[in-house]
Amino acid sequence: MMVSCMGSLWVILSLILTLISGFSLMSSAWYKTDTISFGVFVHCIGPKNMPCNQTCIYYRTLEEIPDIFGKIAAVLLFGGWLLLSFGAVLVLSWTIIPVGLCQRRVCTPARYAQISAVVVTVLGLLVFPFNLHSEFARQICGSSFIYKSGDCCLGWGYMMAIVTVMLSCFLPFIGRYNLNEIKTKILLSKM
């Protein structure tokens, strides 16, 4: 089976954005100072110019995350990543399904999974800065407050998550264009 240009773009972007999103979730560089950085599932202590000398603590359960807003953000962001991953698996499986209407049964749920992933991830990204009001964040960032980072700087991990979700907004549209392309090919082949 030959995959269309838009179909190839949809598959490649879905897989790449899923990987980048997962990588940014596991990053400790969401908010940082010179010696401490913290993210959704990890925080590291040590000089940032010497990453080999940093000590990192990974949160394995929700109870280990220090603040309720951190827990809510973790659930939302992880849920968004799972939906994005599920959509990427569906899109990837679409490439091996034989030509026909069965493709539509995979493409449409993939698009809905990707739309849901974007919505849930945006909510998680909006909730995470509420974590700055916690006692944990105030110990690191000084006089931090909701959406005010105090002595902390915004890190590349948080920015990468924002850029990834912005690019993920295009995935359902690419999938819709791809589905229209499939329908056109089916109609033309029956004529």
Swiss-Prot record:
It is a multi-pass membrane protein. InterPro entries: LHFPL. It holds the Pfam family L_HMGIC_fpl. It is found in: Membrane. The chain crosses the membrane at residues 6-26, 72-92, 112-132, 154-174. It comes from the Eukaryota. One of its GO terms (cellular component) is membrane. The keyword Transmembrane helix applies. Keywords: Membrane, Transmembrane, Transmembrane helix. The keyword Nucleotide-binding does not apply. Its main location: membrane. Belongs to the TMEM211 family. PANTHER family: LHFPL TETRASPAN SUBFAMILY MEMBER 7 PROTEIN, LIPOMA HMGIC FUSION PARTNER-LIKE PROTEIN. This is LHFPL tetraspan subfamily member 7 protein. It comes from Xenopus tropicalis (Western clawed frog). The gene is lhfpl7.
